[in-house]
C-alpha cells in the first residue's frame, strides 16, 4: 500500500451530531425519564457509530481506490493539489459535467487527477483529502 487515508468526520460534524442527544431526549421524554435518556444516548451513539463506519477510505497501490471508484494508475495523466479557493471554483462554476467528484464538505483540500483513458469520457476526478501532497506524489510516482 503506497498511500492510505480514512476520511474521518471532522470535529464540526461530530459536534453537530452530538446535538441529536437533546433532540432525541425531548422527543422521547414523554414516554418517561428512563426511556427518554436511554433513547437519547443510544440514538446519539448509533449516529456516531454510523458516521465512523461509513467514513470512506482512499488507497493507492496499483489502483486508486476511493469508495466504490477504482482507477488503474496507468490511465492517470497528472495529479495536482487543489487549495480551498480553487476547490470551490473547480466543483462549482468551473466544473465539467463529465467529471467524477468525491467531495466531503468538511475537508477543504483536494487533488485533481487528469484521466488519459481514450475509452473513458471522464476528463478528471476530484478527491477530497487532508493530505493532498502525499496523495499526488503517490499517484504520480507509481503510474507506470
Question: How does the language model describe each region?
Answer:
Residues 18-20, 44-45, 56, 112-116:
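Hydrophobic, well-ordered secondary-structure segments
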Residues 130-144:
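Cytosol-/stroma-facing membrane-proximal "stalk/adaptor" domains immediately downstream
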Residues 31-40:
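Short, aromatic-rich membrane-interface segments at the entry and exit
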Residues 68-126:
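Non-transmembrane, membrane-adjacent beta-strand/coil modules in membrane-associated proteins
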Residues 1-28:
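N-terminal membrane-targeting/pre-transmembrane regions
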Residues 13-15, 123, 135-137:
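Short acidic, gly/pro-rich beta-turn/loop elements at beta-sheet edges
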Residues 42-80:
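Conserved beta-hairpin
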Residues 5, 115, 129:
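Pocket-edge structural micro-motifs
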Amino acid at each position: 500500500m503506497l498511500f492510505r487515508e480514512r476520511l474521518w468526520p471532522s470535529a464540526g460534524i461530530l459536534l453537530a451530531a452530538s446535538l441529536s442527544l437533546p433532540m432525541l431526549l425531548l422527543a422521547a421524554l414523554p414516554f418517561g425519564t428512563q426511556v427518554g435518556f436511554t433513547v437519547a444516548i443510544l440514538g446519539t451513539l448509533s449516529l456516531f457509530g454510523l458516521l465512523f463506519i461509513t467514513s470512506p477510505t482512499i488507497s493507492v497501490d496499483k489502483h486508486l481506490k476511493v469508495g466504490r471508484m477504482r482507477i488503474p494508475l496507468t490511465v492517470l495523466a497528472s495529479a495536482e493539489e487543489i487549495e480551498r479557493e480553487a476547490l470551490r471554483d473547480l466543483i462549482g462554476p468551473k466544473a465539467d459535467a463529465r467529471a467524477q467528484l468525491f467531495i466531503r464538505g468538511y475537508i477543504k483540500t483536494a487533488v485533481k487527477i487528469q484521466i488519459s483513458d481514450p475509452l473513458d469520457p471522464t476528463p478528471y476526478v476530484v478527491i477530497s483529502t487532508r493530505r493532498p501532497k502525499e496523495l499526488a506524489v503517490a499517484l504520480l510516482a507509481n503510474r507506470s
